[in-house]
Amino acid sequence: MIQVIIQPGSIQVAGHAGAGPPGYDLVCAAVSTLVQTFVRSAEQLTDTQLHSDIAPGGAFVRYEESPQVQLLADSFFVGVQGVAEAYPQCVQVLDRRERRAEALTAEKQGRYSPNE
């Protein structure tokens, strides 16, 4: 199983989906693509300092929080959550960003709209 942990200023990915043979696992490929897109987008589209260590079976990304990078991190979260919903036996996502948890709680209570 792939475990994705999203925290303020960092993303960690560890494990293998086990949904296919090495090199042919579409779930691993999807998560890897999302991680690499986040890193490349943050590096090329923002002025934020970023450190990444990406290797087979895992990735660790640490970044300075800014509105631009937060939007990219939110986009990464949406994508990886979609993969986890489609393949719950292969991917687990833990969102430990306080701001995100508060926003979801407020949205459920009708106090927050993502468009605000």
Indicate residue ranges for each PLM-predicted region:
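N-terminal intrinsically disordered, cationic/polar leader segments
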Residues: 1-26, 33-116
